[in-house]
From Swiss-Prot:
It is found in: Secreted. Disulfide bonds join 49-89, 187-216. This is Xylanase inhibitor protein 2. The gene is Chib3H-h. It comes from Oryza sativa subsp. japonica. Fungal xylanase inhibitor. Possesses competitive inhibiting activity against several fungal endo-1,4-beta-D-xylanases belonging to glycoside hydrolase family 10 (GH10) and family 11 (GH11). May function in plant defense against secreted fungal pathogen xylanases. Is similar to class III chitinases, but does not exhibit chitinase activity.
């Protein structure tokens, strides 16, 4: 049973609007984000966007950086096809982000200069920049809408420098945000790896992972509300696993509504749900209506 379908007896039309807001989303719509790129069997990026479920897809992961080497790992998906799919998703009003970091990989920012180099590579390889000698893995005419910081290992140094530099590229866009910055944090507040970066105030969204942390399993609503209170200027999302196969913190749809959504959805900076990940959402139909 899908997430929307399961909530209808309890929240009727309100839950439908909350969890199944179809793209394109306005600034005031609750969002439904999904992480894509961890399993080749999850289907293409285009397929995910064509479900009509998601307002944002987050490509995972740009997972090697900071030492003069840059690498993308999207589990064997063909890069050329992803570029075409990015443009297709954007044509449907769906935001496409590239997540940096993740579990595993080889990344850190040992110096301010390394942060500058990573910002330059992200800008010219994946965002709106172009520079001779810098390859664009998704093609010359495909650009993601922003960068998600999913920093799950190493130290905290210089991610604030990276965030400021990426935000600085918005000067090249007139009247709009060309480089959207988001962060995927651990549930316990604060997340020490991202604390300094978030203090810059340049992150439009924060996706709080309500899994992988015993404290959050015990008191998920309280843990999430600490984040919402700390960052009133950012949209704060509830990060969920789509299947009990992934983590014991998986929340049955009814429990999600009664334990969290009925209380937090009225908060002005509630952003929506962030589902990890597309493979398990497709397999379990967690956000579907069937």
């Amino acid at each position: 049973m899908g997430l929307v379908h399961a909530l209808l007896p309890f929240a009727a039309a309100a839950a439908l609007l909350l969890l199944a807001a179809p793209p394109p989303a306005t600034a005031d719509d609750p969002g439904l984000a999904v992480y894509w790129g961890r399993h080749k069997e999850e289907g293409s990026l285009r397929e995910a966007c064509d479900t009509g479920r998601y307002t944002t897809v987050i490509i995972t992961f740009y997972n090697a950086f900071g030492h003069g080497r840059y690498s993308l790992d999207i589990s064997g998906h063909p890069l050329a096809a992803v570029g075409a799919d990015i443009k297709h998703c954007q044509s449907r009003g769906i935001t496409v982000l590239l997540s940096i970091g993740g579990q595993g990989g080889a990344y850190s920012l040992p110096t301010n200069a390394s942060a500058a180099d990573v910002a330059d590579n992200l800008w010219n390889a994946y965002l709106g920049g172009h520079r001779a000698g810098v390859a664009r893995p998704f093609g010359d005419d495909a650009a993601v809408d922003g960068i998600d910081f999913f920093i799950d290992q190493g130290g905290a140094d210089h991610y604030d420098d990276l965030a400021r530099r990426l935000d600085g590229y918005n000067k090249y866009y007139r009247g709009r945000v060309g480089v959207l910055l988001t962060a995927t944090t651990r549930c316990s507040y604060p997340d020490h790896r991202l604390e300094k970066a978030l203090a810059t105030g340049v992150f439009a969204r924060i996706h709080v992972r309500m899994f992988g942390d015993e404290q959050c399993t015990m008191s998920p609503r309280y843990s999430w509300e600490k984040w919402a209170a700390a960052f009133p200027g950012s949209k704060v999302y509830i990060g969920l696993v789509a299947s009990p196969e992934q983590d014991s913190a998986w929340m049955f749809q009814k429990d999600l509504y009664y334990e969290m959504l009925q209380f937090v959805r009225s908060l002005p900076n509630y952003g929506g749900l962030a589902i990890y990940d597309r493979y398990f959402d497709k397999k379990a139909n967690y956000t579907g209506e069937g």
